[in-house]
């Protein structure tokens, strides 16, 4: 029979109606001769009642055979429950079953189909189709669908045009590693899966599309963590003739629409703006979490005269004050934080506690002469814990920024119901790579430099500033964008500053440079990480929880066993050979 409605949508207004439902057996209970079944579908759970006095012996026998995750079809009359269940939207009603058909049976599942399970991640991914039956996973993906629907409606209203760009593209330097796809037709040549549609969307501006968007898959072969995947989805925008402020206004409107339509939250516009240098100086991060205080304090000048060379001779000395936390952290706890500090390049972590108005701790004796100055500079009170890092400014900022976030989580200082958006602006154009031994693009090599610093492309690259902007939410980079270069000579200067010869630039980006000979308009855009945005809206800590079929931390899919080896014939068609590493040879 045709399904009448979703099980999770049956309500009191349906009492007395005969309906047909289809779904999965969530739970079966035998009570006083009656059989109760929780029928589950994507919209929720509906209680079924099978009464032996009101059904045939065949229906009763079928009901007794039911097990968890059997797929069934039931017909019956909706009735009011004697005792309502306030925890369920369907809790005021039940279905008195008159007909029951088993559509399919099921083996015992490797974990219960319910929220809050303790199965490990690889087991969940191995049986992802079962994991996705769990209500919280269904809700996460329904939220994702609502977010994308809201985004599309908003951008359509603003006359953005949805254009698909190629997945098989050209491998270019300056970024994460590419996923390469060998060409069978062009032996020895490779496509790359795009890390973003950056160049193609710029070319669409040259083509006159004016406002482009796409909700698009992107690919990066990089080390994974909780908020990264090898394939991810971004909301990609590009516009012509708009200023930085106008692009940010559009983005804020998009986010405000999504927040209102999916979470019922009215966000305050415009979002705060913070310069990159201020974010690093005060929060130790280019994606500051502004839901709590504990700002970084610069004590370099204050400690210059102390008889402690670690402080007095350091390029920078910075500190954070953990208010009232002196008793929360033992020496052993601080030793653990010291190990964290070393991961960020710090040589160590100095600390003092304020106890009865005096400084206590390993370095307290060196600070006695400046206790009054420290107390004033840091607004110290009894029971405060002060953590110091003496190192380069970059190391001090990064270390204390990381500890700031860690401590806030440990002490419960973060209001998880807050959504604090802000723009980080006025970025450096380049960042120094120790691994490469050279300056690299902080964003990408197509970013427009600020006019007043562009002359430093042939001078001190550290002084070049970009017309770039990142949108940050609760300590996560939600997205980023910039105005782009549209003048050929400036683009060539940018490539040269990055160490490209004219031949290398032409080989890698000749098609873009050629396009700049044909009236390339001023343009700029932005991309928002959809997975990360939905993760934060859903209150999750890992983007795997909002992606239907993600990879694990080894970039593998335990369900399909991808990536996998392929037949020798397929490799031969591609003129490829796989060399065994030493580990493979010994196993």
Swiss-Prot record:
Q: State the protein's purpose.
A: Catalyzes the attachment of L-aspartate to tRNA(Asp) in a two-step reaction: L-aspartate is first activated by ATP to form Asp-AMP and then transferred to the acceptor end of tRNA(Asp).
EC class, as a word, reads: ligase
Question: Which positions does UniProt annotate for L-aspartate binding?
Answer: 174, 220, 443, 484
* GO terms for cellular component: cytoplasm
Q: Which reaction does it catalyse?
A: tRNA(Asp) + L-aspartate + ATP = L-aspartyl-tRNA(Asp) + AMP + diphosphate
Q: What is this protein called?
A: Aspartate--tRNA ligase
Q: What is its main location?
A: cytoplasm
Per the UniProt record, which EC number(s) apply here?
Answer: 6.1.1.12
**Span list, region Aspartate:** 198-201
- What Gene Ontology terms for biological process does this UniProt record contain? aspartyl-tRNA aminoacylation
Q: Which Gene3D superfamilies match?
A: Bira Bifunctional Protein, Domain 2, GAD-like domain, Nucleic acid-binding proteins
Keywords of the record: Aminoacyl-tRNA synthetase, ATP-binding, Cytoplasm, Ligase, Nucleotide-binding, Protein biosynthesis
Which family is it part of? Belongs to the class-II aminoacyl-tRNA synthetase family. Type 1 subfamily.
Q: Self-association or partners: how does it assemble?
A: Homodimer.
PROSITE patterns reported for this sequence: AA_TRNA_LIGASE_II
Cross-referenced SUPFAM superfamilies: Class II aaRS and biotin synthetases, GAD domain-like, Nucleic acid-binding proteins
The record's subcellular location field reads:
Cytoplasm
What Pfam family is a match for this entry? tRNA_anti-codon
Q: Which GO terms label this protein's molecular function in UniProt?
A: aspartate-tRNA ligase activity; ATP binding; catalytic activity, acting on a protein; nucleic acid binding; transferase activity
- List ligand-binding residues for ATP: 220-222, 229, 477, 529-532
């Amino acid at each position: 029979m045709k399904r009448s409605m979703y099980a999770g949508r049956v309500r009191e207004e349906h009492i007395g109606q005969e309906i047909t439902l289809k779904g999965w057996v969530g739970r079966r209970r035998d009570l006083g001769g009656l059989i109760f079944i929780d029928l589950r579908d994507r919209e929720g759970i509906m209680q079924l009642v099978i009464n032996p006095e009101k059904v045939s012996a065949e229906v009763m026998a079928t009901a007794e055979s039911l097990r968890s995750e059997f797929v069934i079809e039931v017909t019956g009359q909706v009735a009011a429950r004697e005792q309502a269940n306030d925890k369920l939207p369907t809790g005021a009603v039940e279905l008195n079953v008159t007909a029951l058909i088993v559509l399919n049976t099921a083996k015992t599942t490797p974990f219960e189909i319910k929220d809050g399970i303790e199965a490990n991640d690889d087991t969940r991914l191995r049986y992802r189709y079962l994991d996705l039956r769990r209500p919280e996973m269904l809700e996460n993906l329904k939220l994702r669908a609502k977010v994308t629907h809201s985004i599309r409606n908003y951008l359509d209203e603003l006359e953005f045009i949805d254009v698909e760009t190629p997945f098989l593209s050209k491998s270019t330097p300056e970024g994460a590693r590419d996923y390469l796809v060998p060409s069978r037709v062009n032996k020895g040549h490779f496509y790359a899966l795009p890390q973003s549609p950056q160049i193609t969307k710029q070319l669409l501006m040259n083509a006159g599309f004016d406002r482009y968007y796409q909700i698009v898959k992107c690919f990066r072969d990089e080390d994974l963590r909780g908020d990264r995947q090898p394939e991810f989805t971004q909301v990609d925008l590009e516009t012509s003739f708009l200023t930085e402020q106008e692009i940010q206004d559009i983005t804020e409107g998009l986010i405000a629409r999504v927040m209102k339509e999916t979470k019922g939250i009215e966000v305050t516009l415009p979002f705060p703006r913070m310069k990159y240098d201020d974010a690093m100086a005060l929060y130790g991060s280019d994606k500051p979490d502004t839901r709590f205080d504990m700002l970084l304090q610069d004590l370099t000048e204050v400690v210059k005269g102390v008889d402690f060379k670690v402080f007095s001779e350091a390029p920078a000395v910075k500190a954070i004050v953990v208010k009232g936390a002196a008793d929360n952290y033992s020496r052993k706890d601080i030793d653990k934080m010291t190990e964290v500090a070393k991961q960020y390049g710090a040589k160590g972590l100095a600390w003092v506690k304020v106890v009865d108005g005096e400084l206590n701790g390993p370095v307290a004796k060196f600070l006695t002469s400046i206790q009054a100055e420290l107390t004033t500079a840091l607004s110290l009170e009894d029971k405060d814990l002060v953590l110091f890092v003496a190192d380069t400014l970059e190391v001090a900022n990064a270390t204390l920024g990381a500890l700031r976030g860690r401590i806030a989580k440990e002490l419960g200082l973060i209001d998880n119901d807050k959504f604090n958006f802000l723009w980080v602006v006025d970025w450096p154009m380049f960042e120094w790579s120790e691994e490469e031994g050279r300056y690299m693009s902080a964003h990408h090599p197509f970013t427009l430099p600020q006019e007043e610093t562009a002359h430093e492309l042939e001078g001190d690259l550290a002084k070049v500033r970009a017309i770039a902007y990142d949108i940050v939410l609760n300590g996560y980079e939600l997205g980023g964008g910039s105005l782009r270069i549209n003048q050929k000579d400036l683009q060539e200067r940018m490539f040269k500053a990055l160490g490209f010869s004219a031949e290398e630039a032409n080989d890698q980006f000749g098609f873009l440079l050629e396009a700049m000979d044909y009236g390339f308009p001023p343009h700029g855009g932005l991309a928002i990480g959809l997975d990360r945005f939905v993760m934060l809206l859903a209150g999750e800590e890992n983007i795997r929880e909002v992606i239907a079929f993600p990879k694990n931390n080894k970039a593998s899919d335990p369900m399909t066993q991808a990536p996998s080896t392929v037949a020798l014939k397929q490799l031969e068609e591609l003129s490829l050979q796989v060399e065994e590493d030493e580990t493979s040879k010994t196993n």
